[in-house]
Amino acid sequence: MIGFAECECIIYDAGSLKEKRAVLKRILTRVQNKFNVSISEIGYQDTWQRTSFGIAAVSSSRVQTEKELQRVLAFIDSFPEIERTITRTEWF
């Protein structure tokens, strides 16, 4: 089972694209190191306070994949500098 989550977020403290990318890189790197998922920025790459990223997880069951994605989203929510506004989930 493949689970995919697309998240749109606001980065309030980013005053430039450079600051946005520094915050985003730190978060994405920590997610990749802690969880067995793929994550990448997929939208709003030239907008300095908004971002959209995709997270993909693969496992043998939907329940396990859903739990992994929920843990990743909770971990992302623990960062005070980013606020998740919209999340869409798909299953393949």
UniProtKB/Swiss-Prot annotation:
Pfam families in the cross-refs: DUF503
Cross-referenced Gene3D superfamilies: TT1725-like
Protein name according to UniProt: Uncharacterized protein YlxP
Matching InterPro entries: DUF503, TT1725-like_sf
Gene source species: Bacillus subtilis (strain 168)
